Amino acid sequence: MKQIPSVDLGDFLSVDTNKRNEFIQNIGKAYEDIGFVALKGHFLDQDLVDELYAQVREFFSLPYETKSKYEVQGLAGQRGYTSFGKEHAKGRTTGDLKEFFHFGQHEPPTNGEKYPENVLVDESPAFNAVGQKTFAALEKTGCFVLRALALHLGLDEHYFDPFIKGGNSILRAIHYPPITEEPKEAERAAAHGDINLITLLMGAQGRGLQVKNHQGEWIDAIAEDDELVINVGDMLSRHTNNKLKSTIHRVVNPPKSAWHSSRYSIPFFMHPVSDMKLDVLPHCIDKNHPKRFEDITAGEFLEERLRDLGLRK
């Protein structure tokens, strides 16, 4: 496969059974083949997108001394600001060429889950507000994607609903600053797989994001202006015994002629509640597909991966 498939969530939301079933088949096949799709028909409107990017640019343009006030020790980067070069890919020690800011759930979950409070930026109330609105729109979109995948897997359509309601999801605003000197080995984001169930990515409209296909080739993952890129994370891959693929991807450094440019990218990492069991689904195991993963909860898996990323000591 040389490019990621495109699907329209409007087909799944349609009253037309044929369109709905075609969406389920197409997204399921894409996630079995390459683990990525470009999705249109989501719940983000363009005005919200424009406001979000304006506020993200404004925040990252603040002096480091101001931004660093929002880097809270002891949170493993799960809320607020994480400074440049602090996070690295699993199995690497060289930090990625990025800084980022995390938003989590804005209301305390009613299911008893306890998460760190969001870090509010005093200098920009609008940044806090647009983050909350974007979180809600992407969470809603992700819910319907998971409903389609549940049906593809032969599960009840609402199988994932109780696990993602009040889940430990994170909206991450990323700034890849201009490159000022030849990187020795660092990339904007080194090759990695995502931790969570699914990731919904804004900002894949230009070259930079690459996906490794089954032939071991790196292909560009480029979306249209009205599309999100959505990929399978390691939690969902484990749960389905790798039937749905968590594909390795990276953000490569631009050509030298574009070093002076910043890049902004905004992924939404959809996490379940921490006590969700990621045990392999029984009907994803057979003699040709033996169980590949040990039993673990989402919370245990997250802690393990935060240590791998250098965010938890």
Give the residues covered by each predicted segment.
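Peripheral, non-catalytic segments flanking oxidoreductase cores
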Residues: 1-313
